[in-house]
Amino acid sequence: MGRFGAVSYRQVKQSEADTIEIDSLKNGDIEKYNEENDKISRIPLAQLSINKINGIKSSVIEELSLKRPSYFMATKMIKSLLPYYWKKNPFKFRIILCVSIIFFSKLINLSVPLIFKNIINTLPEKVEWHLLILYGVLFLIQKSIWDIRDLLFQDVNDSATKQINLETFDHLHRLSLSYHLNKRTGSLIKIVERGTSSVVQLLSLLLFNIFPTLVELFTVSTFLLFSYGAEFAFINLTSCVVYIAFTLYVTERRTKHRRLANKKENEASDIKVDSLMNFETIKYFTAESYERKRYDFALMDFFQTNKKSKVSYFLLNFGQSSIIVIGTTLGLGLATWRASQNGFTLGDVIAINTFIAQMFSPLSWLGSSYRMILTAFTDMENLFELLDTQPEVSDSPNAKELNFNDTNNPSKTILPSIEFRNISFTYPNKNKEQQQSSPKILDNISFTVPAGKSIALVGSTGGGKSTIFRLLCRFYDVDQGEILINGENIKDVTQTSLRSIIGVVPQETVLFNDTVAYNIGFGNREANDDQLIDASRRAQILSFIESSPDGFRTVVGERGLRLSGGEKQRVSIARALLKDPPILILDEASSSLDTFTERKIQQAINEVSKGRTTLVIAHRLSTIIHCDEILVLKGGHIVERGSHSYLLDFNGDYAHLWNQQQLSASDLQYTPNQDTFE
């Protein structure tokens, strides 16, 4: 069950999607959809980007999906927001005080025109100075009371904003790796930013715009009915009802333009973020003009879509203004005619005109508020879908912490052993039929890493080496079999305790846009300076850090762009050393290092691997000859296993690969039309 109730957003959207699909098939729109898919197939592969694919998708299907918002979901959203506001006594008191201010302000709104009426009616015989002073005081309160209300409510809003942001942030980190691999960072950021601001905006609009307007409509109409007659109450009510109905009708129909504009803006943002994140690659291929054209096309698409939204906005405002003018003119005309018949005083005419004009003032905000509410609903849909998404990998209800303490001596830690038992795995696919027909990445493999020993995995790219590490860290759950650490299935322990004992040096190191010290210290945030320096020295990165003008305060740039590949790799090694984990994973830990530095790093790795359970992925076989056992993976199977010397004597795939790598550079000969060196 999702956070926002028993009926999840995903279930509602699925129901809507099913309806859309049936409608589209009935209308023959699927033929147009297929025609536009044919357009995609005719694009040269080198120019086929995801943005072009999305741009050619059938507009018919898109518009069907944007036809109407779900009021059922809107109700659930409002209920879901209440706990963020109605939670602590100080905040409850402030909300009650703000609502009291609303009723007080409506009494003032009724009093001001009546006082002004009495001032006018006493002229020119005399001037009621006490009424003038009272009018000025009430008018000042009328203008400033909303600022007082906003000031009182600010802390409530800030608290709700903070809580929603933190919950969204935590939820993003709880989601599985596969979710993030299938999402674009730019779109996620936009979803969170727009959705979070809309969540906070929605309740404020309902509480301080819609509710006060309805209260004022009731009080003004009631007063006009008993003080001036049913015709004035009728004009006021009819004008307001027509205004509200027109606003609701037009605004609902312009919502689809807003949704489509959001989608196009997300696509433009994705292109911009991807382009900046691949800054260096763009420079290598002198692709600045091409990227500019891509971004220009996306912006043009967004502005064309947004223009439709702006036109519909103009039509809405024009219609609202027309209704206001007609209602005000009718009320003023009737009051003037009554005055000409000696039925009303001049003060009555001014009071009636003021009441009607004063009523339309919040009504003008009602239209804006309703548009903003629908906009907030539109922006919140993606956020709530995100929050309703459940991670593919989650802790079981009875999950326990991994414990390596010796039962006989609790202060002593037992080194962990690792066992992969009959493991089969295929990466998840939304299309279940495609997943079932996809080849298995791992097919019924079994092996054991004894406590304190090291095992290396070698083989061709795509053979399943990195998949084994991802399964061990439980980024995915296996399709078949079980992974055991000290005899415990990793599905029965918490993910946090599992990953806390594993240190990883990935093949492609991604660093935070922060200092070198922060990135190394990420391995152990409680480490002191001496420990951090020692880890840097053992990773052969200390001399580089000390030679930099800012030392450990050197900022590495976005994703570590200011560092070379070898420097990033050594920072990653230092981070793993600082964590001091009982299980160490080295995924091509020396892949970005020169031969001289590689030898130094290898010595450090050999040293730090002692007393740990270690798994190593390597293409350079010279780095794994010290491992206790080497597994050769091919097609998801273990085809060879044994020590370095045993596998050389076996003279199989490992020996062939070893002999190739031992050839001197002068002996390497590239054969055309082949993908390997011979």
Curated annotation (Swiss-Prot):
Domain ABC transmembrane type-1: 95-375
Annotated PANTHER family: ABC TRANSPORTER B FAMILY MEMBER 6, ATP-BINDING CASSETTE SUB-FAMILY B
Descriptive protein name: ABC transporter B family member 6
GO biological process: one example: transmembrane transport
Every ABC transporter domain range: 418-660
Record family assignment: Belongs to the ABC transporter superfamily. ABCB family. Heavy Metal importer (TC 3.A.1.210) subfamily.
Any Pfam family the entry gives: ABC_tran
Organism field: Dictyostelium discoideum (Social amoeba)
Gene assigned in the entry: abcB6
Superkingdom of origin: Eukaryota
Membrane-crossing segments per the record: 95-115, 128-148, 206-226, 230-250, 314-334, 346-366
Molecular function terms, GO-annotated: ABC-type transporter activity; ATP binding; ATP hydrolysis activity; ATPase-coupled transmembrane transporter activity
